[in-house]
Design a protein with these regions (language model features):
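Extended interfacial segments that mediate partner engagement and assembly in macromolecular machines
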Residues: 25, 32, 50-52, 57, ...
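Short, surface-exposed secondary-structure boundary micro-motifs
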Residues: 30-31, 180
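Short, Lys/Arg- and Gly-enriched loop/turn segments at beta-strand edges
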Residues: 32-43, 187
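Ferredoxin-reductase
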Residues: 1-23
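Short glycine/serine/threonine-rich phosphate/pyrophosphate-binding segments
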Residues: 60-66, 142-145
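Structural motif
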Residues: 50-52, 78, 133
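Reductase modules of NAD(P)H-dependent flavoproteins
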Residues: 80, 84-192
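A generic structural signal for residues embedded in beta-strands
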Residues: 27-28, 177
């Protein structure tokens, strides 16, 4: 059994929202790309790292299994989840079981009003938290502002480029980007 987390925006996802457990898809591809970089790190070294995740909207879905994996290996990370409204906060119970969870909503309808970057800035500048790495997954604009903040705070940051994937094979080139001086494809080499 798999769980698919999506937001009904386009024609396909609007049709998907009407499917019930047990209904079938014609085709399904995934997972795409490579596992999280954490999976290849030495666990004892990873336990020394202070890690923060910033998730926006449905970007919370790929953050959860990473947090769960870390938790299963004795590592507790901080997680900041941002959503437009209370109704769009997902996986709260699951996330709080495997991380130190902070929630913010754009409209202030749940927990704290503001953006994930507001919480991250507060944790570092007002609460004295220090992080060795930040992982940001969510809308491109959210990841941009997380990167601007983490650059200012001198926190190395990993982003997920899954929003730009199209065909998942690297053939179309839509998810091509430069990492350093090397061409990478989010769907094959990423998404992080």
């Amino acid at each position: 059994t798999i769980t698919i987390v999506f937001m009904p925006i386009g024609e396909s996802t609007k049709k998907m929202k009407d499917l019930k457990a047990g209904d079938a898809f014609m085709d399904f591809v995934g997972p795409l790309g490579q596992p999280s970089e954490f999976c290849s790190e030495d666990i004892e070294e990873l336990k020394k790292k202070r890690i923060v995740f910033v998730a926006g909207g449905v970007g919370t879905a790929p953050v959860y299994p990473q947090l769960k994996w870390l938790h299963e290996h004795g590592i507790t990370a901080d997680a900041i989840v941002g959503a437009k409204t209370k109704d769009l906060v997902i996986l709260e119970k699951e996330m709080s079981a495997v991380s130190n969870l902070y929630i913010t909503t754009d409209d202030g309808s749940y927990v704290r009003k503001g953006m994930g970057t507001d919480v991250l800035r507060d944790l570092v500048q007002n609460q004295g938290k220090q992080y060795d790495v930040c992982v940001a997954i969510g809308p491109m604009i959210m990841m941009k502002f997380v990167c601007l903040l983490t650059k200012e705070l001198n926190i190395p940051t990993v982003v997920s480029m899954n929003p730009i994937m199209v065909d998942g094979t690297g053939m179309c080139g839509a998810c091509r980007l430069m990492v350093g001086n090397e061409v990478k494809f989010a769907c094959v080499d990423g998404p992080e």
